[in-house]
Amino acid sequence: MKHALSALISICQREGLRFFGQTGRLVAALVRPLIWLFVFAAGFRAALGLSITPPYETYITFETYIVPGLVGMILLFNGMQSSLSLVMDRELGTMRLLLTAPLPRWWLLTCKLIAGALMSVLQAYAFLAIAAVYGIRFPALGYLTVAPVLLLAAFMVGALGIALSSTIKQLENFAGVMNFVIFPMFFLSSALYPLWKMAEASALLHDICAANPFTHAVEAVRFALYVQPNWFALGVTVAAGLVFMGIALWGYDPGRGMVRQKAGGPAGS
């Protein structure tokens, strides 16, 4: 137990030092959603009307609606960015040292996932603070109730990133694979438009967005900010996170997963 906690603390410290040592990474993580908030949302405010739907009890501006979605964007991009370090560690050889430590492989990957999730939550709160200064505020208690939901959402997208990293052979391929995943997940969700708006445009588009686990992560965050639990969205988020983590563990299993295939298969082949 002591060694397991030491590994968790060490990996969290390593992730924190790497993150705070790259100030450009923090700035980039915040600039992206802020541009959406200040430019995109302001431009579409008059064109996109929003009806009163839960968790909202009155009409809201488009900026207010997309803030939870932009929080989800931060979690999504940082989860994928965090998995990039696994690809780098594999190329540098430090991944082998990590995975051969006298601890269960699932625990080491979970520690990596927890460390990345904590960094994502810090970025999300930094964005919420800027949004509050801009005038978009939520109930005071909502900033507390959203914390565990942010962790669960960050866990889900982080697990997806780790699962994908097990399939990437070279660092050069990372950007293409991540963009192939990030943009469909983000745009085919309720991050920017409510599902009922999607249904008005296309029933098929609505069904795709409703099946997207990122949609449920965003909705869980949205409801938590208004101190209203959305148990269905939370359940889907947790279930998707467990499935993605299971795929990640299989991918990093040297006997069965993608790591073995990259190494050239069994010794006798």
Give the residues covered by each predicted segment.
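Membrane-interfacial helix-loop-helix junctions in multi-pass membrane proteins
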Residues: 18, 55-56, 137, 190-243
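Hydrophobic alpha-helical transmembrane segments of multi-pass membrane transport proteins
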Residues: 35-40, 60-134, 180, 185-186
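Alpha-helical transmembrane segments and their short interhelical loops
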Residues: 105-179, 228-251
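Transmembrane helix segments
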Residues: 42, 46-48, 165-211, 215
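Junction motif at the cytosolic side of a transmembrane helix
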Residues: 47, 225, 235-269
